[in-house]
Amino acid sequence: MARINPNKLYVQDVTLRDGMHSVRHQYSLDAVRAIARALDRAHVDAIEISHGDGITGSTFNYGFGAHDDTEWIAAVAGECKFSRITVLLLPGIGTVHDLKYACEAGARSVRVATHCTEADVSRQHIEAGRKLGMDTVGFLMMAHMAPVEKLVEQALLMESYGAECVYVTDSAGALLPKQYAERVKAVRGALKPETEIGVHTHHNLTLGVANAVAGIEAGAVRVDASLAGMGAGAGNAPLEALIAVLDRMGIETGCDLHMLMDAADDLVRPLQDRPVRVDRESLSLGYAGVYSSFLRHAESASKLYGVDTRDILTELGKRRMVGGQEDMIVDVALDILKSHGAEAAQ
């Protein structure tokens, strides 16, 4: 699906999808309508809406959502005249049938997300997105965990399946600007000129905006961000801050900065039951290279078993756990508790 203005940076908001993690997937329909309406009026190119772990992510493992994905999608679609409605789909969680239902509810773009070494599982879903006439994107998560050459190989696979854009996704907020730029530049250089590159950053090391800018300078033309940084861990690149920086750089976005500031402070921040910020727990995510959405699961395990959240996250990083292994968080907490008991007995 061709973009309306291919010469302008494409701004993809993720407040209503990645931000789901911040509220344990409990956005009300009224809340998503109000936020979508504000984003649409501010002329954000696209708005992603679904369970934090993608369509059909509402499960015991990831957390149950307040509403069905199609309800959320339809609510957002009903408010938008300008912005394209986007969904996230993780193969193994969401299916082709789920994607069809999302499209019927109003979604016009899909990002098919896999771990950065598992692009081969995305073929069926990327092909389905193209057949449905959707803007179809490949989304390589946890990009810090693969060498540059491997990342390029996986991006080429997604492109060969029909992806019109491939994202280099720093799901853990673990990359430094130079490292991120290196990955984006390599992927940009390997793919066809017409295949776009996107960047998705997290703020766990306070580098969300800096990494987004580094990725844009390295060749990305799509960028993710969220109002007030609403997202997993310490959040994503704050949309209003990113737009301000890009404006200072002379990069056209077409977004209304003041409207975004108002939406961030008036609509989004009041919904946070846990502040989305860099603190000892979220900083540990970036430092240990752990999937950002593990934060609230790890905090729950910490409270239940009396183990420091940082210890849980550090051990998850050592074990190289990735998205989809949320069930291992409790195992790690119990192992730490057991080791503490053994130490006390000595």
UniProtKB/Swiss-Prot annotation:
GO molecular function: 2-isopropylmalate synthase activity; 4-hydroxy-2-oxovalerate aldolase activity; manganese ion binding
Membrane-spanning segments: none
Binding residues annotated for Mn(2+), in chain numbering: 18, 200, 202
EC number(s) reported in the record: 4.1.3.39
Transition state stabilizer, annotated site positions: 17
Keywords tagged on the record: Aromatic hydrocarbons catabolism, Lyase, Manganese, Metal-binding
SUPFAM superfamilies: Aldolase (SSF51569), post-HMGL domain-like (SSF89000)
Annotated positions binding substrate: 17-18, 171, 200, 291
Origin: domain of life: Bacteria
Record-linked InterPro entries: 2-IPM_HCS-like, 4OH_2_O-val_aldolase, Aldolase_TIM, DmpG_comm, DRE_TIM_HOA, PYR_CT
Single GO BP term: L-leucine biosynthetic process
Matching Pfam families: DmpG_comm, HMGL-like
Catalytic reaction annotation: (S)-4-hydroxy-2-oxopentanoate = acetaldehyde + pyruvate
Enzyme active site: 21
Every Pyruvate carboxyltransferase domain range: 9-261
Enzyme class: lyase
Entries under HAMAP family matching the protein: HOA
PANTHER family given in the database record: 2-ISOPROPYLMALATE SYNTHASE 1, CHLOROPLASTIC-RELATED (PTHR10277:SF9), HOMOCITRATE SYNTHASE-RELATED (PTHR10277)
Similarity section: Belongs to the 4-hydroxy-2-oxovalerate aldolase family.
Protein name (database record): 4-hydroxy-2-oxovalerate aldolase
Species in which this protein is naturally found: Methylocella silvestris (strain DSM 15510 / CIP 108128 / LMG 27833 / NCIMB 13906 / BL2)
